[in-house]
UniProtKB/Swiss-Prot annotation:
<dbReference type="GO" id="GO:0003743">
    <property type="term" value="F:translation initiation factor activity"/>
</dbReference>
<dbReference type="InterPro" id="IPR003029">
    <property type="entry name" value="S1_domain"/>
</dbReference>
<dbReference type="GO" id="GO:0043022">
    <property type="term" value="F:ribosome binding"/>
</dbReference>
<comment type="subunit">
    <text>Component of the 30S ribosomal translation pre-initiation complex which assembles on the 30S ribosome in the order IF-2 and IF-3, IF-1 and N-formylmethionyl-tRNA(fMet); mRNA recruitment can occur at any time during PIC assembly.</text>
</comment>
<dbReference type="Pfam" id="PF01176">
    <property type="entry name" value="eIF-1a"/>
</dbReference>
<keyword id="KW-0648">Protein biosynthesis</keyword>
<keyword id="KW-0694">RNA-binding</keyword>
<protein>
    <recommendedName>
        <fullName>Translation initiation factor IF-1</fullName>
    </recommendedName>
</protein>
<dbReference type="InterPro" id="IPR006196">
    <property type="entry name" value="RNA-binding_domain_S1_IF1"/>
</dbReference>
<dbReference type="InterPro" id="IPR012340">
    <property type="entry name" value="NA-bd_OB-fold"/>
</dbReference>
<dbReference type="GO" id="GO:0005829">
    <property type="term" value="C:cytosol"/>
</dbReference>
<keyword id="KW-0963">Cytoplasm</keyword>
<dbReference type="InterPro" id="IPR004368">
    <property type="entry name" value="TIF_IF1"/>
</dbReference>
<comment type="function">
    <text>One of the essential components for the initiation of protein synthesis. Stabilizes the binding of IF-2 and IF-3 on the 30S subunit to which N-formylmethionyl-tRNA(fMet) subsequently binds. Helps modulate mRNA selection, yielding the 30S pre-initiation complex (PIC). Upon addition of the 50S ribosomal subunit IF-1, IF-2 and IF-3 are released leaving the mature 70S translation initiation complex.</text>
</comment>
<keyword id="KW-0396">Initiation factor</keyword>
<comment type="similarity">
    <text>Belongs to the IF-1 family.</text>
</comment>
<dbReference type="GO" id="GO:0019843">
    <property type="term" value="F:rRNA binding"/>
</dbReference>
Length: 72
């Protein structure tokens, strides 16, 4: 899957789950299960419930995603 195939959407973290997984509610109301991308993990970026995040979704599975950015 190339970089052009992903769908980027904004959302809000609803719940922090084990193993660096998060439940994120998207702007359109859907809830997805998302994990932290490698760059956020390497730089120890903390993500807490209530944070606004950018999520990348695969066109093949729209229920799972990757958190790529945390808004300030």
């Amino acid at each position: 899957m190339s970089k052009e195939d992903v769908i980027e959407v904004e959302g809000k973290v609803v719940e922090a789950l084990p193993n660096a997984m998060f439940e994120v509610e998207l702007e359109n109301g859907h809830k997805v299960l998302a994990h932290i991308s490698g760059k956020l993990r390497m730089n120890f970026i903390r993500i807490l419930p209530g944070d606004k995040v950018t999520v990348e979704l695969s066109p093949y599975d729209l229920t799972r995603g990757r958190i790529t950015w945390r808004a300030k």
